[in-house]
Amino acid sequence: MSAYKVSLRELRFFLWELHKTDQHFLTRAPFNDKSRAYYDALLERARAFADELGKAYQASDRQECRLLENGNVEIPKEFHTLWQRYKDEWIQVLGNDSETQQPALPPLIRQTIQEMFMGANPAFMTYGGFNFPAIKLLKLHGTAAQKATYLRKLQRYDWDACFCATEQQAGSDLTAVTTVAKPLENGEYAVSGEKVYISAGMHTLTENTVYFVLGRINTTTSTSYSLSCLLVPRFWPNPETGELEDNHVECTSLLRKMGLKGCANTQLVFGRSGTTRAVLLGDRKNAGLLQLVPLMNQARMSTAIIGLGLASSAYLHSADFAGKRLQGRAISRTSDASAPAVPIIEHADVQRMLLEMKARVEGCRGLLGKLTGASTQAFALEAEPVLDEAQVEKYRKLVLLFTPICKAFVSDQAWKICELAIQVHGVEQAGNLG
């Protein structure tokens, strides 16, 4: 049984009735090559895959990830099959076109599919979860050589990417980052230091992992503006033979969390057992934070969508459970000892909780729709024969405005919705209570 529930009726209402996506966007470039019927069928396919993701979610929390003696990380076994399906069936559908900056899907529709996948199994979705922003970073800032080496591999998800900023002694204080990079020959750098809380930081789903590491080349200053972004592949691609060589990136421990145990949350060490080679993103020193702004915004979006997906599933599970769980008598017969038990959904306080959950879920989805709707509009305007730069800038600024608001508000509301879901469910029936 899947741990995930979704209502396609609600998602279709969001797309076709609230935002009228078919009328406003599917009739305009660059989204006029697919019909509403195509996207309705795509939602059905996404629900079927989300159901499989949901089945693996609870199993992955029980199995957890394990650090092996050889330094490799063992992830839940179900993830390998799911990863191959995700690559084969969904990467091209969800990803950006390799030759242009246009999205493969209208952002509004992409939101609904990501809500299903991230809500069904957020642990699995951390693997390869940084590829999308990594591709964007390389397109924006990478040198020709860096694009030739990394871009296609990341687009095909043959390799994956991770972002490495946090250090044990630093936390969120980037001025305390101590990872350093010393120049080598041929424009390369030797990186040394440790990073913690690196989600999906080591696994065998892909041939290679590219770490985007914040570190210092100039160690005489300790401001956040003296940080550089270094590309550190787990296995160094030999430019002559194409073979992948050990680049001395080690996982020294897996950090424990309350949940999301199927995600390999790693502590990584660079340069301890040998030289860890790196290249500087775009060959630009001390520009790491400026380069990584698009990454931060993508991470905020993902946080909001994960929260929405989990909250929506929690509400739907609660509504289903409340309709089946028999407890208490109808309020009109509370004093009648012979009165039958009724489903708890008939009790006023349970109705209040369910209505509150539904209202919060729809509010969160609607707020995210403001963001993705503005993004969809911006892409459509950019594809117009006569470009209205002022209008494009207006909608791009709206995206920037809504992004941190969505991250903060939706993640906070998701917590409250899931708290109410726990209250509705009460206790899990786990065997003979007598």
Where are the regions that the model predicts?
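A glycine-rich, basic-preceded beta-loop-alpha segment at the flavin cofactor/substrate interface
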Residues: Y197, W236-T252, K257, Q267-A299, ...
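A short core secondary-structure module
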Residues: E188, S192-D246
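C-terminal helix-coil-helix/basic helical segment that borders enzyme active sites and/or dimer interfaces
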Residues: E362-F409, I422-Q423
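Extended amphipathic alpha-helical segments enriched in small hydrophobics
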Residues: R300-E384
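Amphipathic, small/basic residue-rich leader segments at the start of a protein or domain
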Residues: M1-T126, A145, T149, T376, ...
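A short, Trp-centered hydrophobic/proline-enriched beta-strand micro-motif
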Residues: R156-A165
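N-terminal glycine-rich flavin-associated loop
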Residues: T126-A144
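Alpha-helix capping/hinge segments and adjacent helical runs
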Residues: S2-K5, P183, L260, E393-G434
